[in-house]
């Protein structure tokens, strides 16, 4: 059985392993812990975990952003959607995204936006099956 719920401090070690699976790099444990706690405390962040038989199998992070256009309703940016390789093909990514969309609706967001690497073809199929589409916008990123 899969349970999707907000993450807690005791999930830190398992989440660190998931993030390493996503990026291929290990984050300094002290920095990771400090940032993790800040995210948990910030009401504009939603950090969800998907648990399969009590084990953290996936995660997604949403950030609610204010907007100054139209009705000034907020929107949500979704980042760091990852399902462990050991738990794929169980519908976990879909459940995480649907739960994140519910969080966005509860916060009166008028849309959800996400960026996904071109190589993540399977993830793109999931997003498209959930109604996400390419609106002709280009994503740009600058690293510092």
Predicted regions mapped to residue ranges:
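A short beta-loop-alpha structural element at the N-terminal edge
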Residues: 1-15
